[in-house]
């Protein structure tokens, strides 16, 4: 922010200058002196404060002009004013020059001043109101004491008949659209008119032009028009000076989320320009700057309350749908069914989208992240979710191959954690990747870069490429502990399964049958004894447990978890022709979490005393924590297609009460 400038005097002539309140004018009396001059005196209007600065020492000048000072190259004048002028050029400073012993001035130089107030203002203190001239408005800092304005990407669609998000064009069709934007006020105060040759200009840099847009409301009382003045091809806008005390209201929208090449910070400037002569560029004599940070996209972990549960209606999932509906009715959320005309045979709604939100002090709304997967559900987020106060964002790779790891069953987020004194109050994003140096599948770089650039939920890469589908939700999830600010990490465990089966075998239940009543699963009769005696299956699951333990160690380190924070759920996997794992029975960790109510894949485990021993075991682990276990039959509609309950559902949750700008990344 330019706060000091130099004005050059010329003996024998009158110089006019505009002074902006809060700045200082410097003028060199020595270089403006006529030949033979040795001393000078000063006269000035009462509205001007004049100081003679000699060798760094300042002396304030009274208005009568009797005192004289010796001319020297180290002598300058410092001028300031405290109030805006009511008339142009109404304040003046006169410098009289004298010969060494002369009593009458040999010449003089005059400076005629017009004082105005200019301030570009935003909500820099983040209280939802635009304050006046916050001294920290040009910078941006994190933390509860941080300063700096916040901008939302205007990625919802307030006008239903538009094909895309509101930020995709340069038009505003409603006041609702303006409410998504941050307010910016240009405050001016001064005489009815400025001296000739001055202009006030709003502008942005070329590098910010695709990241921010600014609108102005014309004729706010008679047939409002919303004028796009900055952004995209428009780098500057001349503001009409109206005189008196004025406030011009602008609305600012974000156009892009933070990304690999964009930190999220944008700046808007206002400059007062001075005209010199035709064909000579205007010169900036004052600049004020405001800085915004574009609000990041934030994921919501399982510990947050659910708002809506989404599930697809298929030809073969009527019973599954009914059980999910019964589960949802126990909670305070609503069930939203994606019917066949929209899902077009694609049941994997978890893989297509991830729900999150954006927030500023004045507003927030949910935003869905659309995966690069683009199955038959690809139109669902645009056609069914994007709307008023419901935003949309996507990232599509240009040259990378999209794999199963780009589906959002491979994108989860932890509850809030503190790791080695470093707080993650919004949790940490978890994505599955390939084993180091293996050259396997990995989530596409454009999505990873997007997640990293949001800054507030620092991602952790896990190892999921050992699985056929390769998603982190196949081996882990988080559950809240009702009534406490605690959670547990649930992990699939083949060793826990073998331990349970061996216990049941010792108790005399070795012939207990799995998949009882499901003749379509296999023509073979599968018992505990057969599983425990299958050496190849045992070896495979020992390898799979090593893969699980690798992830367990990463999660313990990156989330600062201890063994008491982790609950092992029995699981078995079998190796496919590519030596990757698929679930042997419905994978219970792939559950839906709705507060204390858990919708768990029904495992169809060995029947011990007419009860599934896997269900009994899991209830014994979770129900003492206050959680309610509902086992949902997904075996024919999801499990046989390599997915479970979590893969076939999606949950939009309430946002964090914690404000993201209060954290320090």
From Swiss-Prot:
Which residues does the annotation say bind Ca(2+) 2? Answer: 154, 156, 158, 166, 177, 180
Cofactor names: Ca(2+)
Q: Where is the active site?
A: 647
Q: Which tissues is this chain's protein expressed in?
A: Spinal cord, submaxillary gland, cerebrum, cerebellum, and skeletal muscle.
What the entry lists under InterPro entries is as follows: Cupredoxin, PAD, PAD_C, PAD_central_sf, PAD_N, PAD_N_sf, Prot_Arg_deaminase_cen_dom
Q: Which CDD domains match?
A: PAD_N
Q: How is the cofactor bound?
A: Binding of Ca(2+) triggers a conformation change that is essential for catalytic activity.
Where, by residue number, does Ca(2+) 3 bind?
Answer: 156, 158, 180, 389
Going by the UniProt record, its keywords in alphabetical order are: Calcium, Cytoplasm, Hydrolase, Metal-binding
**GO function term, MF aspect, one:** nuclear estrogen receptor binding
The record, for SUPFAM superfamilies, names: Cupredoxins, Pentein, Peptidylarginine deiminase Pad4, middle domain
**Could you name the domain of life of the organism this protein comes from?**
Eukaryota
Binding-site residues, Ca(2+) 5? 354, 408, 411-412
Q: What Enzyme Commission number(s) does the record list for this chain? A: 3.5.3.15
Q: Where along the chain is Ca(2+) 4 bound?
A: 166, 169, 171
- Catalytic function, reaction form: L-arginyl-[protein] + H2O = L-citrullyl-[protein] + NH4(+)
Q: Where in the cell is it found?
A: Cytoplasm
Q: What GO biological process term is on the record, naming one?
A: estrogen receptor signaling pathway
Q: Which residues form a coiled coil?
A: none
Protein name from the UniProt record = Protein-arginine deiminase type-2
List the source organism: Rattus norvegicus (Rat)
The encoding gene: Padi2
């Amino acid at each position: 922010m330019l706060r000091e400038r130099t004005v050059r005097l010329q003996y024998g002539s009158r110089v006019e200058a505009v002074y902006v309140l809060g700045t200082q004018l410097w003028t060199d009396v020595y270089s403006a002196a006529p030949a033979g001059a040795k001393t000078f005196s000063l006269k000035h209007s009462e509205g001007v404060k004049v100081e003679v600065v000699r060798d760094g020492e300042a002396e304030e000048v009274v208005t009568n002009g009797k005192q004289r000072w010796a001319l020297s190259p180290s002598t300058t004048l410092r001028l300031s004013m405290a109030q805006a002028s009511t008339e142009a050029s109404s304040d003046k400073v006169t410098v009289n020059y004298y010969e060494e012993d002369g009593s009458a001035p040999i010449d003089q130089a005059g400076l005629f001043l017009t004082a105005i107030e200019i301030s570009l203002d935003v909500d820099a203190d983040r209280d939802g109101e635009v304050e006046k001239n916050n001294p920290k408005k040009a910078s941006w800092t994190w933390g509860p004491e941080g300063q700096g304005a916040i901008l939302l990407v205007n990625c919802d669609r307030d006008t239903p008949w538009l094909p895309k998000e509101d930020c995709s064009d340069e038009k505003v069709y409603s006041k609702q659209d303006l409410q998504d934007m941050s307010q910016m006020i240009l405050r001016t105060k001064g005489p009815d008119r400025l001296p000739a040759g001055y202009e006030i200009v709003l502008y942005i840099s070329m590098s910010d032009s695709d990241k921010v847009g600014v609108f102005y409301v014309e004729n706010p009382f008679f047939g409002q028009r919303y004028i796009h003045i900055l952004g995209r091809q428009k780098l500057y806008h001349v503001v009409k000076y109206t005189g008196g005390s004025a406030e011009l209201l602008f609305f600012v929208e974000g156009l892009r989320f933070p990304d690999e090449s964009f930190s999220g910070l944008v700046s808007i400037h206002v400059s007062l320009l001075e005209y010199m002569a035709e064909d000579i560029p205007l010169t900036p004599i004052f600049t004020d700057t405001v800085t915004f940070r574009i609000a990041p996209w934030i994921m919501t972990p399982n510990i947050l309350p659910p708002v809506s549960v989404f599930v697809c209606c298929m030809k073969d999932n009527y019973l599954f749908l009914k059980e999910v509906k019964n589960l949802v009715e126990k909670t305070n959320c609503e069930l939203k069914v994606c019917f066949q005309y929209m899902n077009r045979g694609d049941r994997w709604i978890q893989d297509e989208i991830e729900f999150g939100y954006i927030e500023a002090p004045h507003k927030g709304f949910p935003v869905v992240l659309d995966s690069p997967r683009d199955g038959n559900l690809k139109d669902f987020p645009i056609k069914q979710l994007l709307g008023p106060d419901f935003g949309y964002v996507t990232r599509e790779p240009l040259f990378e191959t999209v794999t199963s790891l780009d589906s959002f069953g491979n994108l989860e987020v932890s509850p809030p954690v503190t790791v080695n004194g470093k707080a993650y109050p919004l949790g940490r994003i978890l994505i599955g990747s390939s084993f180091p140096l293996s050259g396997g599948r990995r989530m596409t770089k454009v999505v990873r870069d997007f997640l990293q650039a949001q800054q507030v939920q620092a991602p952790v890469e896990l190892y999921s490429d050992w699985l056929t589908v390769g998603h982190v939700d196949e081996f882990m999830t988080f559950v809240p502990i009702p009534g406490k600010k605690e959670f547990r990490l649930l992990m699939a465990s083949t060793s826990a399964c073998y331990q349970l089966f061996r216990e049941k075998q010792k108790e005399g239940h070795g012939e207990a049958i799995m998949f009882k009543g499901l003749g379509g699963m296999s023509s073979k009769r599968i018992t505990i004894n057969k599983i425990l005696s299958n050496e190849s299956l045992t070896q495979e699951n020992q390898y799979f447990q090593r893969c699980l333990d690798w992830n367990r160690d990463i999660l313990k380190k990156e989330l600062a978890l201890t063994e008491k924070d982790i609950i092992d759920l029995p699981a078995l996997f079998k190796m496919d022709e590519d030596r990757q794992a698929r679930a042997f029975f419905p994978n219970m960790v792939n559950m839906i979490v709705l507060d204390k109510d858990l919708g768990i894949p029904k495992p169809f485990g060995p029947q011990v005393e007419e009860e599934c021993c896997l269900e009994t075991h899991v209830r014994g682990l979770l129900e003492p924590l206050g959680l309610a276990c509902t086992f949902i039959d997904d075996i024919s509609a999801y499990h046989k297609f390599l997915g479970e309950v979590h893969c076939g559902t999606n949950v939009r949750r309430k946002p964090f009460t914690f404000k993201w700008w209060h954290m320090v990344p």
